[in-house]
Amino acid sequence: MGFHSKNNSEYNGDFIILSSIYYWMILLYCIKFFLSKYLIYCMSLTYIDLFSGAGGFSLGFDRAGFHQLLSVEIEPHYCDTYRANFPDHQVLQQDLTTLSDDNLLRHINHRKVDVVIGGPPCQGFSMAGKIGRTFADDPRNHLFKEFVRVVKLTQPKFFVMENVARLFTHNSGKTRAEITEQFERLGYKVKCKVLNAADFGVPQLRSRIVFIGRKDGGEITFPEPSHTEYNTVGDAIGHFPKLNAGENSLILNHEAMNHSTQMLEKMSFVKNGGDRNDIPESLRPISGDVRKYIRYHSDKPSVCVTGDMRKVFHYEQNRALTVRELAALQSFPDDFVFLGKKIAQQQQVGNAVPPLLAQAIAEAVLKMNTNE
């Protein structure tokens, strides 16, 4: 009984056939993969993020399915953080006032912009209306006018502008009306509302005014609260390893700052959720910001996170919160990295739009666009 064995040419022929099959299978998979990515790219609503900071607003819009075209931020450390977390985004480290119309359009390849988002710093609240000039005329509010300029240039379907809640009532509501009028002159229907981030899952009582403009004149709707029971400080940061003042950890940005012996002694008297009144009168600070020398309450949302939380202590550990913990109170994910010196990192966190709030706003914009 004989055995038939294949010669080399037959083996080579089989190998070539199999290789060809695998080649076409891989090629078809790659075509399908990149085609799906391209379709998502083409169908996604696009946005520009002005005064983007560390990227809280961008993160929320990305999660809702938007496609970023450009972000503009002047501060170097903010840009470093943004680039580290959004490697596929285009971010310009530049003063928006020096970015010409032509260069802005060139950076986005003259693509259609669907949404312009941002929170322009407005410093002229205290004086506008009191010395005979309007909010828009106050030179300290020139960045607001830059936001208006970009909206006028790109003519997006929508714009979303976020700012501090006191703008709603400033100058008996005249400032709010003036801002609205600036955009109405460009043909936008505009509404504004004060939103509390805690209503959307952020473990923090943080109220912000949000202006939404719509180019087609359709109905403007704001996101409906998703949380009647608020997430708490304990919910947000209870899983992080305990640290003493000055200690570090292997977790990203989870490094405790040093405190003076006097500060640690004073704060040792303050109970969970307590304030300076818990400190013995002989040690108690006589004056100063009432928002300092307090402890977070483990079973309540956080007080509003700012760029300096060094005298607001952990509910059970005798130290201020780490950047990682503060970021969690702003609803940033645990893998979101913050770069720069610690105080710069804290400022990045405190000045950010909470991603969960941003996502809720983005989803409201998507819904309006779908129902146009």
UniProtKB/Swiss-Prot annotation:
Q: Which family does it belong to?
A: Belongs to the class I-like SAM-binding methyltransferase superfamily. C5-methyltransferase family.
Task: Give the catalysed reaction(s), semicolon-separated.
Answer: a 2'-deoxycytidine in DNA + S-adenosyl-L-methionine = a 5-methyl-2'-deoxycytidine in DNA + S-adenosyl-L-homocysteine + H(+)
Q: Which purpose does this protein serve, as stated in its record? A: A methylase that recognizes the double-stranded sequence 5'-GGTGA-3' and protects the DNA from cleavage by the HphI endonuclease.
Cross-referenced Gene3D superfamilies, in alphabetical order? Answer: DNA Methylase, subunit A, domain 2, Vaccinia Virus protein VP39
Protein name per UniProt? Type II methyltransferase M1.HphI
Q: What is its EC number?
A: 2.1.1.37
Q: Which residues form the signal peptide?
A: none
Per the UniProt record, the source organism is: Haemophilus parahaemolyticus
Q: Which cysteines are joined by disulfide bonds?
A: none
PROSITE patterns referenced in this protein's UniProt entry, alphabetically = C5_MTASE_1, C5_MTASE_2, SAM_MT_C5
Taxonomic lineage from the root = Bacteria, Pseudomonadati, Pseudomonadota, Gammaproteobacteria, Pasteurellales
What gene is it encoded by? Answer: hphIAM
GO terms for molecular function, please? DNA (cytosine-5-)-methyltransferase activity; DNA binding
GO annotations under biological process?
A: DNA restriction-modification system; methylation; negative regulation of gene expression via chromosomal CpG island methylation
InterPro entries the record matches: C5-Methyltransferase, C5_DNA_meth_AS, C5_MeTfrase, C5_meth_CS, SAM-dependent_MTases_sf
